[in-house]
Design a protein with these regions (language model features):
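Membrane-proximal, proline-rich intrinsically disordered regions
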Residues: 27-29
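Alpha-helical transition-metal enzyme core signature, strongest for iron centers
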Residues: 13-20, 43-58, 95-105, 109, ...
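Surface-exposed patches in mature extracellular/periplasmic domains of secreted proteins
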Residues: 32-35
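Residues at secondary-structure transition points
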Residues: 4, 11, 37-45, 88-92, ...
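Short, helix-capping/interhelical loops that line the mouth of catalytic, cofactor-
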Residues: 1-8, 52-129, 158-180
Length: 180
């Protein structure tokens, strides 16, 4: 029984990434180096970190088709990416990378054969137990949602009302105006 297909995952990730891009666009570039606490990621670092995950998935599951994470050097991989979170890429480039990388990831996941999605990857030193490729890809979507929530809190700290809240408030404001 299939409960959730690669196409459905790609469709839902498109919504997640669209909302991430809206946040990236809403935050002024002058605030991209803001970090809410010492030792936390800045807005720029968080967005680059999120963009890196789609590259990670494509590398692991499409290019290398790894069946085991044993011997994979996570630090080296992420340090070598153009989206390394320590790079000072401008806002326009970050938004473009989020848009293009997200769509590339979604296009690939959408066409992923279910048999390949069901393959298990031994996690080795990356964590206990094996996971299917599909579970790992869902984990990437959850990971982005987690960091997007952090960015929404940062928006509030910067005095920005997140777009999802603004969108929800508009119909309520229109209803109030029509009754007065």
């Amino acid at each position: 029984m299939t409960l959730y297909t690669p196409k459905q995952l790609a469709d839902s990730m498109r919504v997640v990434r669209k909302n991430t891009i809206a946040i990236a666009e809403d935050i002024p570039e002058a605030q991209y180096d803001y970090r809410p606490t010492q030792g936390s990621r800045s807005v720029r670092e968080t967005l680059l970190h999120m963009a890196s995950m789609t590259l990670f998935d494509l590398h692991i599951h499409e290019e290398q088709k790894r069946t085991s994470m044993d011997g994979f050097d996570f630090r080296e991989f992420f340090a070598g990416l153009p989206t390394n979170e320590k790079n000072s890429l401008p806002k326009s480039v970050i938004v473009a990378v989020l848009r293009d990388g997200g769509e590339r990831w979604c296009d690939w996941v959408e066409k992923l054969p279910e048999a390949q999605a069901a393959e298990f990857v031994t996690r080795g030193g990356a964590g206990p137990g094996d996971k299917s490729r599909f579970e790992m890809l869902i984990g990437s979507k959850e990971h982005e949602i987690h960091h997007r929530a952090q960015l929404m809190v940062i928006q509030r700290l910067l005095g920005i009302v997140p777009h999802l809240t603004r969108n929800r408030q508009r119909p309520q404001e229109s209803a109030k105006e029509s009754t007065t």
